[in-house]
Amino acid sequence: MSERQSKYFDYQGIVISSTGQDNQDSETDLVYLIQAHGKAAPKNIMYGVSKCAFVPTNLERNFDNIEEAKNLERRSKIPLKFGEVILWNESDCDHDKRIILHIKREKPIYEASSSRNGLILKVGGVIQPTSTTSFWTPLCTVTMPETEATRAEPDVWLYAWIRFETTMKSGLDPFNMTATFESFDSCDPSDQARVCEAPWNAGSPDSKFGVWRPDPKPADSDDEIDIEPREGWHLPEDKWAEVIKMQLGLYVGERLLICKELSQFDFIIPLQKPFSRGTDKTLIYPAVGEYFHFSAIWSMQHNGFLIYELQPVPLLRQHVTSVNGNLLTRVVPASIRGLFVDKEGTLGLIDDPHHLLSFFEFHPAGYEFLKAMAEVRAVRTSENKSVRYRIVRTSGMSIFENWLRDTQFVVGPVKGIRINEDTVICAKHPNVYFKIPNNLKEGIPIGGGVQFVGKRQAGVDSEIMITECSPCPAFTCKNYSVSGDTRLFQVYLKPNCDHEQLAESDSMGFVDFRELETPCRGKFLAWVRESITVNDCRRAATIMEVCSTAICPPLIAMSANSSRATSARTTPAGSSIGSRSSIQSRASAATSVSSNRFVGPSSRRTPSGTPQSSTSSRV
């Protein structure tokens, strides 16, 4: 090879197998092509290595010392091993015969080992988000068993053991190679930038093909202005840091920890592994409801943190869980009306999307002293930013349920706003629907403010019938019809200093900001709508959600999942006398997190709902 060629090589390959016995007179090993001319090589190409590749060239010209020449000759004759990477140039191979004539050994790239099934390689790769049993690697894509797929997070650079097998005897044979997933090995936080090598992340800002958008900064430090914000403006505290160390988190299943102090972030276990506990050193998996100290690093792909250190905290009592893997806790009304907190104050805000406790505040025991046993489900920040728990079922509340079945009571006078044909909501009772009869609608248009008195009928779960009402111009707001019953309302909101997900309206109470950023000021105008229904319950933490802070009405795509499309606006059961048992059975059917700590997480299904269990892929 020339001096120029020794610095750059056209091809890179990895040794997969020895050649067949009939071909060993001319070839020694089979090499799978993985890179050509600095780019990913075309798939399904295998070369044989000629015996002459182990004979050094130009010994006399390069060495005057005979001992050095002998050492070079001896090193050149060392046989290739499974998993070893070699380099060669265009002039060093015969493409027609699929044979390599001269090689350059590369430093070790892949760790090789063996299992009871054969030789295996430790290869880095990424689980595909849209197909959670597909593991992409720079060498090939393999299919994992579901039991392994549930242990790992998609879009994280993980190391796994993969078995490569071929029935080829020489480079001229028809291509045949099978890659089989064996098991996961580890996750290294320092390698997470390699996630952008996956084809679906080519446009990521972290990718070498992406460009960071620069932040505008003054050219001179003298140009900086240091003044206090105006009175009444709220500047949210920025708790973000690239690395979080030794925080306390609650494991809620599906490789997710929630930290009460940093509830706006997800803390994800990228690769779930068992750990030993107790004197018998039995290996167990984390259980739902356990507390851990953890350290984590920021991940742009997940818009959250990946945990790289996890230590159990045995001194803190574990939460009780249901058979569905949800947390069982006693809840009490929170200071934010319509929401709840657990009695011990360890979880943070809890919402009630199924309206199971909408009449909780009217019980004679009093708003501040009544407690309910509830089954709550944790959600990721993509569903709720800071209200991280949702009530899916209540139990052990026979006294409250008997009271609901037999009791009538009167509410009002209170002020609210009419949001559709037959529904009024108010800030004082934000999780209750008030139904306005046809004979009282005159003079109160949709979007109009109303002062009313309502009467609750026995057996009705989450609505109260209005018996008296009159217009309230102070609460009337501008509204805009998108299509059918879908309407947008422009109201003034105030941000909540403690919970950036929530803002408060005088006429509607607290509303959910979803993924929008809360403006840093006192009062501001925003367009709100009734929350969309997902899985038979509202997606937002409150009845109303913000869709824009622009002055003009936003363009909203109509969805079949809107609340008006899926239910009559009465109770969650779709009937003004809906059964609480039917509501709770649907609520408990929501996706829950569960795991067996001795055998690992439960099976995960693909987005199509079809389980996948095949473990090998033909490349």
From Swiss-Prot:
Tree of life domain: Eukaryota
Low complexity: bias regions: 563-592, 600-619
Presence of keyword Metal-binding: no
Pfam families named among the record's database cross-references: OB_DEPS-1_1st, OB_DEPS-1_2nd, OB_DEPS-1_3rd, OB_DEPS-1_6th
Keywords: Cytoplasm, RNA-mediated gene silencing
Segments of this protein annotated with the region Required for prg-1 binding: 62-101
Compartments where located: Cytoplasmic granule; Cytoplasm, Perinuclear region
GO CC terms: P granule; perinuclear region of cytoplasm
Database matches in InterPro entries: OB_DEPS-1_1st, OB_DEPS-1_2nd, OB_DEPS-1_6th
Tissue: Expressed in germ cells.
Disruption phenotype: RNAi-mediated knockdown results in sterility and disrupts the localization of pgl-1 to P-granules at 24.5 degrees Celsius.
GO biological process: regulatory ncRNA-mediated gene silencing
Stretches for region Disordered: 563-619
Subunit structure: Interacts (via N-terminus) with prg-1; the interaction is direct. May interact with edg-1.
Function: Component of P-granules which is required for P-granule formation and integrity in adult germ cells. Promotes the accumulation of glh-1 mRNA and localization of pgl-1 to P-granules. Involved in RNA-mediated gene silencing (RNAi) in the germline. In particular, it is required for piwi-interacting RNA (piRNA) gene silencing and positively regulates the formation of secondary 22G-RNAs, which are RNA-dependent RNA polymerase-derived endo-siRNAs, typically 22 nucleotides in length with a 5'guanosine residue.
Protein name as it appears in the record: P-granule-associated protein deps-1
Gene source species: Caenorhabditis elegans
